[in-house]
Amino acid sequence: MYSIYNHTTGQYGTIYHTLTAARAMAHAYSLWAKNDRDVIDMQTGEVMSQFSKGKETYRAKG
């Protein structure tokens, strides 16, 4: 399971069952709010993607 971390508020958001859904929502939220969001793997704590103002700036392999 994956969650979205909001850099502005320091809070985690909704839990998503698929990485694709989490990345899509992080992209949308980042674009809409013009801020940074991370997609976090809830089991390992690994950052899977980072978005900055709607652009994906990092993507983990896998």
Task: Label the predicted regions.
Residues 17-27:
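Charged, amphipathic alpha-helical segments
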Residues 1-13, 21, 38-41, 53, ...:
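Short aromatic-glycine-(Arg/Gly/Cys) micro-motifs in beta-strand/loop hairpins
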